[in-house]
């Protein structure tokens, strides 16, 4: 391992092994590398292979990729499964445990590289423990929303009290979901203990991927939950890059009227059920808007796309040229910034919500799992979208409701006000982003000075 960058303070970054965590860590790494920090970016080999091309091409002198090998004591986790991507859900906590068991290998990396600071993620307080063994300061970075993180922490430290920003029935439902999550275990440790330790071990402050422009009330609630200062780092959006494969999509978009297309995507790690797929398809047709649908099926899924979609759906959209279905990866940031896009039908993963906000695209929320319902509240709080309501009894998604909300956000008179608000938020987030990053750099340099 190359350790020759002694003229700059160095940060070893260790994200959780999921796309939604690795990508924001990498964007933060790029920004810090431009502020005279040398970055060691540490992950499993297959994650580095997936994310590393852009780094090696454009940041090879300032961001160094460091492989962390997980122990081979987990036969169900071969190298291709040392990431959450395409990992069967029942193996997630096997992966959490295997990651923790890599602590000795991580200690060897620390001993060799001797970084100035360590930045770690919510799932691995053990990384902070390892850092302190070598007298290295460690900082928690949360690539999640402030609403999700504050609600999580509230349920750990104040479980019997009302969370001040949710209605009682909503809090009751989401608290049940989050308490189930908090009581899952890996290596005999409950999630709630793992997460609390992650907060407690962070040195002086905690970084979080958000902006005061959109989540000020949730950020201001943190001091009542923990001793550390919470510092927003801004949106951390990856700059769109051009690939030849994008041409077909961009050409199709360019044929459409301004703000006439809905972009539909439900993330890279959640896969809608066949029933949800049918209702989304029905809603898109009933809304009569143009649309691009980034369509993904789980790799273990036996169905084809044609079998997953309603009968005749693909033929109908091809005939009327209303829609395009794209399987697999799509240039999401590039699509969202295109002038033809008038709405974003999204699962409300935090990365997608922030991208929609930065590019000023109104959001039609279809939250499906995890913290997505809480993220959707940020969209509504800021007046830049709506959530598709589900059946109150069985939580089923309905195509008619999908169509109604799409029309409201994209086509009807109210859409003008939503678009105006989306544009205002976009401009404000861009303006405040540099100031927020300046605070991050200042805080890190304070830690560097103390470590000298």
From Swiss-Prot:
Q: Which organism is it from?
A: Citrus maxima
Source species, domain of life: Eukaryota
TM spans (from-to):
136-156
Residues that hold UDP-beta-L-rhamnose according to the record? 268, 330, 347, 351-352, 355
Q: List the disulfide bonds.
A: none
Q: What does this protein do?
A: Involved in the production of the bitter neohesperidosides in citrus. Shows a strict specificity for UDP-rhamnose as donor.
Name under which the protein is recorded: Flavanone 7-O-glucoside 2''-O-beta-L-rhamnosyltransferase
Q: What is its main location?
A: membrane
Q: Which InterPro entries match?
A: UDP_glucos_trans (IPR002213), UDP_glycos_trans_CS (IPR035595)
* One Pfam family here: UDPGT
Q: Which GO terms describe its cellular component?
A: membrane
Catalytic reaction equation(s): flavanone 7-O-beta-D-glucoside + UDP-beta-L-rhamnose = flavanone 7-O-[alpha-L-rhamnosyl-(1->2)-beta-D-glucoside] + UDP + H(+)
The tissues where this chain's protein is expressed are given as: Expressed in young fruits and leaves.
Q: How does the record describe its quaternary structure? A: Monomer.
Does Protein transport show up as a keyword for this record? no
> Its induction, per UniProt?
Inhibited by 10 uM UDP.
- Recall the taxonomic lineage recorded for the source organism: Eukaryota, Viridiplantae, Streptophyta, Embryophyta, Tracheophyta
């Amino acid at each position: 391992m190359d350790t020759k960058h002694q003229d700059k303070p160095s940060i070893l970054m260790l994200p959780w092994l999921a796309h939604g965590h690795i990508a924001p860590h990498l964007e933060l790494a790029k920004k810090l590398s431009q502020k005279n920090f040398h970055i060691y970016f540490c992950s499993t080999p297959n994650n580095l292979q997936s994310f590393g091309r852009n780094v090696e091409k454009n940041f090879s002198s300032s961001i160094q990729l460091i492989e962390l090998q997980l122990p081979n004591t987990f036969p169900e986790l071969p190298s291709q499964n040392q990431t959450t991507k395409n990992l069967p859900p029942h193996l997630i906590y096997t992966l959490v445990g295997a990651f923790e068991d890599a602590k000795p290998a991580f200690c060897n990396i620390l001993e060799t590289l001797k970084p100035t600071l360590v930045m770690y993620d919510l799932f691995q307080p053990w990384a902070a423990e390892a850092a302190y063994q070598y007298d290295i300061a460690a900082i928690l970075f949360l690539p999640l929303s402030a609403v999700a993180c504050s609600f999580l922490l509230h349920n750990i430290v104040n479980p019997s009290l009302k969370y001040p920003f949710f209605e009682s029935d909503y809090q009751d439902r989401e608290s049940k979901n989050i308490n189930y999550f908090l009581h899952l275990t890996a290596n005999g440790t409950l999630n709630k203990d793992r997460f609390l330790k992650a907060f407690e071990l962070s040195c002086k402050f905690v970084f979080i991927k958000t902006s005061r422009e959109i989540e000020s009330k949730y950020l201001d609630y943190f001091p009542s939950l923990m001793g550390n200062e919470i510092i927003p780092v801004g949106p951390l959006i990856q700059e769109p890059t051009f690939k030849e494969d994008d041409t077909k999509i961009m050409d199709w978009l360019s044929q459409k009227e301004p703000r006439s297309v809905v972009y539909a995507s439900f993330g890279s790690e959640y896969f809608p059920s066949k029933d949800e797929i049918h209702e989304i398809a029905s809603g898109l047709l009933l809304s009569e808007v143009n649309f691009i649908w980034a369509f993904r099926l789980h790799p273990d899924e036996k169905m084809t796309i044609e079998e997953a979609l309603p009968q005749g759906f693909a033929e109908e959209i091809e005939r009327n040229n209303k829609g395009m279905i794209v399987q697999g990866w799509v240039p999401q940031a590039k699509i969202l910034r295109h002038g033809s896009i008038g709405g974003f039908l999204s699962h409300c993963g935090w990365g997608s919500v922030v991208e929609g906000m930065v590019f000023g695209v109104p959001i039609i929320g279809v939250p499906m799992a995890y913290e997505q319902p809480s993220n959707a509240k940020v969209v509504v709080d800021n007046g830049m979208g709506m959530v598709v309501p589900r059946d109150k009894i069985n939580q089923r998604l309905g195509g008619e409701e999908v169509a109604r909300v799409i029309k409201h956000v994209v086509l009807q008179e109210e859409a003008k006000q939503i678009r105006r608000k989306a544009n205002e938020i976009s401009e404000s987030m861009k303006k405040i982003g540099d100031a927020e990053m300046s605070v991050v750099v200042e805080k890190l340099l304070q830690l560097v000075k103390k470590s000298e």
